[in-house]
């Protein structure tokens, strides 16, 4: 189940965090709270059961209709799919890279086809932790400071939309704030 936790940016540390300002697993509350901060959050049906050996082209073909709908306005001409499993050879290196606070010059749009991941958005004096699960689509606007945790045993597949043909390009902030917040097990 999707979940939102809003914390003060001055969280003490990951093992004894400050009390959250808000916690909810109500989809309407999650959508409304994120919308107040310029973040789009939607539920799309992940209607295709993918084979465990599905490759990127299979995933993109399975969701061709949804991809075409998003790309129709021309904002996101580039799309790919990422699938990380507990046996992925680069899972730990990828986790560490995504855990560092960063921004993008373009929106970060992710549709979770399978599994889950934790987006942490550093907006003003707050950190919003958004647990995204299958069927969730999140659009993090360009320039938003954030990090992503896939957990120590990741199991997710997401379709990623880009307005940049080069795909995922991050500008790391150098802020160690992510170390003060809980991560996925």
Swiss-Prot record:
Site (Important to generate the dianion): 110
Listed EC numbers: 1.13.11.54, 1.13.11.53
GO molecular function, one term: acireductone dioxygenase [iron(II)-requiring] activity
Cofactor: Fe(2+); Ni(2+)
Catalysed reactions listed for this entry: 1,2-dihydroxy-5-(methylsulfanyl)pent-1-en-3-one + O2 = 3-(methylsulfanyl)propanoate + CO + formate + 2 H(+); 1,2-dihydroxy-5-(methylsulfanyl)pent-1-en-3-one + O2 = 4-methylsulfanyl-2-oxobutanoate + formate + 2 H(+)
Cofactor binding, note field: Binds 1 Fe(2+) cation per monomer. Binds 1 nickel ion per monomer.
Site annotation May play a role in transmitting local conformational changes: residues: 107
Annotated keywords: Amino-acid biosynthesis, Dioxygenase, Iron, Metal-binding, Methionine biosynthesis, Nickel, Oxidoreductase
Record-given protein name: Acireductone dioxygenase
Native organism: Prochlorococcus marinus (strain MIT 9303)
Gene, per the UniProt record: mtnD
């Amino acid at each position: 189940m999707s979940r939102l936790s809003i914390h003060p940016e001055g969280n003490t540390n990951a093992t004894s965090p400050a009390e959250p300002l808000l916690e909810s697993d109500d989809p309407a509350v999650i959508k409304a709270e994120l919308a107040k901060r310029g973040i789009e959050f939607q539920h799309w049906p992940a209607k295709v059961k993918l084979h465990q050996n599905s490759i990127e082209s299979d995933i993109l073909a399975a969701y061709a209709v949804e991809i075409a709908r998003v790309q129709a306005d021309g904002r996101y001409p580039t799309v790919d799919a990422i699938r990380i499993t507990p046996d992925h050879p680069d899972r730990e290196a990828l986790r560490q890279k995504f855990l560092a606070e960063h921004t993008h010059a373009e929106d970060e749009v992710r549709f979770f086809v399978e599994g889950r991941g934790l987006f942490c958005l550093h907006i003003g004096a707050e950190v919003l932790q958004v647990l995204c699960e299958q069927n969730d689509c999140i659009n993090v606007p360009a320039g938003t400071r954030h990090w992503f945790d896939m957990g120590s045993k990741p199991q997710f597949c997401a379709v990623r939309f880009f307005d940049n043909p080069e795909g995922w390009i991050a500008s790391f902030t150098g802020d160690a704030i992510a170390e003060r917040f809980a991560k996925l097990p």
